[in-house]
């Protein structure tokens, strides 16, 4: 059917808006975490506003279209009598008023999804019927000029509620002191008494739908967002939307620079004056005595300013950790704390635990230690990380690199599914790389079998880089399978051995696997936990290959365009494909062509002089760093050429132009690498300092 002339098509334009709203609430419904009270209430408030607009739309159609058509045709009935909009609005009000805890939220969510799906199934065909049935009838019973007039009135009525010009006028009025005074002058009690009257006459910014408000908020900086969060409860919830807090720069914010876009100029070092000012601030802050009197301290004006800035930075960091990141942490992609005067290892540890999806982390020249990465002690808990800068972090040792490598996860296999193994030694610091095969005689065991059989003998990790692993001393491990839809509380697991849990099974795996040489290890994998990191990344895939020069027999891995097959390096047992199933951890997923772990592109350990060869080799575990292009090891005084060679062999994408290490080390690609960057540097470790 040919489309009707735009001038007399009374349904298409309003229906476009209604269909857009349907798409928006379907998308929000699929992304809402119903266990989170803030997400739950934000969804209901958005749905309530959406369905109020649906009701307004149908009231306009009844008055200006259907009502007129009924006057000229006796065959037209009340087409909006069974739309159930009032029932849906009552459902949302009930959820906002009566649902009090997580259990009730989850039960309500099931009912909500069913009701929304039923409504959507009816609402979309209803609009199609109006366009295909009633529009031709309008063309039959009304003249061209009459239809033009009807459409003009319909559009005008819709715009009287959500007209862009009116909204812009509301935004303009919002900036006037007179309107602000009018908004704030009423007390809470007076507001509640006059709420109905105000809502009837107001068409300002408070009536904007949430998606429009989020679009407006996206243009604001963090300081402005914090101010907006104090306007109302609705705005407070909207300003805690994750998309508004993707990039964090607390150090710059504390100094008045409120930039919050993507990280830029990644390789550019600040000038000497900027670094000196940051060091002066840090020194003044750490030497400052909080109990000292003004007369006693006798600080200069410059020192007072430095202390004030450092104090501001500390307060800002505490505010982020306690008031912002618990809500938006999973959405944070960039965190830059370079040259921070006040950040501590504890703060970094808390931030990293709340931000499992970080892609860019810059801790340049901060006073952190290995403990800052304690929250990264779990396999794959930050496997999206692409940029890590620890330049000048002099307290960092191999321990931190072990945690970092573990957090990057395990390289995904592109050809077959793998099953993760675990042993009883959870505190092990080395990874033992072993592929596993399924036993065909016994695949599943109930929970009580776990208490009757040993998990496996403890594997010696004292010399993990020189001692080959023998399969003779390794018994069959168990892999715990948890139903992701029925996770138990961690405290409940204490009683698991005393009762039967139907949703938990253990899978027994074979133990006849070994590597032809030393250097292939895998990390103990512990069970699922309630942490955000575990819930998102516990299903990291198995090793794709070891990536060490020990097992590569001199092969120049970094010159290859693709990663070699594991069979080319190690004699391993044949892998057994696992069937797809919701109770199995299956790694041959639909997204197997895209790596989900070990995607690091940039790594700088410049000035981390306590790093040794062991730390470099730890980075080669789990498949190495196949995407790494930039590696800065300037000032790492104790590493050797052998350790560098082992790391380089696991970094096939490394660019010599961005490969830096000490000039005194006879390492790989000595003729093409860029050498040391810390020569004559006043604030980074270097073997030639003082020359």
Curated annotation (Swiss-Prot):
Compartments reported by the entry: Cytoplasm, Perinuclear region; Nucleus
Annotated metabolic or biological route of this protein: Protein modification; protein ubiquitination
Activity regulation behaviour: An iron-sulfur cluster promotes IRP2 polyubiquitination and degradation in response to both iron and oxygen concentrations.
Cofactor(s) for this UniProt protein: [2Fe-2S] cluster
Keywords for the protein's UniProt record, in alphabetical order: 2Fe-2S, Cytoplasm, Iron, Iron-sulfur, Leucine-rich repeat, Metal-binding, Nucleus, Repeat, Ubl conjugation, Ubl conjugation pathway
Principal location listed in the UniProt entry: cytoplasm
Residues annotated to bind Fe(3+) 1: 15, 57, 61, 130
Post-translational note: Polybiquitinated upon iron and oxygen depletion, leading to its degradation by the proteasome. Ubiquitination is regulated by the hemerythrin-like region that acts as an oxygen and iron sensor. Undergoes constitutive ubiquitin-dependent degradation at the steady state by HERC2.
SMART domains (UniProt xref): FBOX, LRR_CC
Subunit organization: Part of a SCF (SKP1-cullin-F-box) protein ligase complex. Interacts with ACO1/IRP1, IREB2/IRP2; the interaction depends on the [2Fe-2S] cluster. Interacts with DCTN1/p150-glued.
Physiological role: Component of some SCF (SKP1-cullin-F-box) protein ligase complex that plays a central role in iron homeostasis by promoting the ubiquitination and subsequent degradation of IREB2/IRP2. The C-terminal domain of FBXL5 contains a redox-sensitive [2Fe-2S] cluster that, upon oxidation, promotes binding to IRP2 to effect its oxygen-dependent degradation.
Protein name: F-box/LRR-repeat protein 5
